[in-house]
Amino acid sequence: MVLFTLEDFAVFKATTLATRMHLIREQLDPKFAEAATVIVPLLQTDQQAIYSHIAKHQRRYRNPPPNTWVAFSTSSRGYKMVPHLALGFWDDRLFLWLSVLRESKPASRVLTGITAMATTLPGKWQVAGEHTDKAMLPLTSANLATVGARFQTIKKAEFLLGKVYLADDPIWADPVRLWQDIQQRVVALKPMFDQLVQNV
């Protein structure tokens, strides 16, 4: 069973590239790999294979990565060019984002049907417009419209919808419950993931 814990955030206390990369490879990547064995079957269908991509950080030469993740997409070659699901860490949060990055453009109709589906999601969710920034907004009809409109009109804007688990969230006291919640949210996001894939 995959158990993400508060101890995982200690990876980001390492201040050098070599040390942080070593900790990511030793501590987080094995958990991402194990998580993938559960999440891939939740997303794939008989008609559509899903592939996992653990961040490699190959372009890092000096500064340590501020975050790390595993992404799930319909492409075996990568994930940035297509809608995907990303599960990962910053130094103060775990995130699960359904993402359409700028590399997926131009795809003017990519968000078709997503707004109506998103507003029916149970529980608390977040939206954001930039995957390299921690900034996020609670999922409301107004915030969803704002992020969606920005995505459609600004070249570098992105679209992210999902769940962020801040390090001070009480759910971290029960790693089993956290992992169950992640799986439930993957299932909840799957219809939108499928719609985005169809739209592109």
UniProtKB/Swiss-Prot annotation:
InterPro entries in the cross-refs: UPF0637 (IPR009403), UPF0637_domain_sf (IPR053707)
Record-linked Pfam families: DUF1054
Superkingdom in the source lineage: Bacteria
TM stretches of this protein: none
Family affiliation: Belongs to the UPF0637 family.
HAMAP family noted in UniProt: UPF0637 (MF_01851)
Name the record gives this protein: UPF0637 protein LCABL_14170
Organism: Lacticaseibacillus casei (strain BL23)
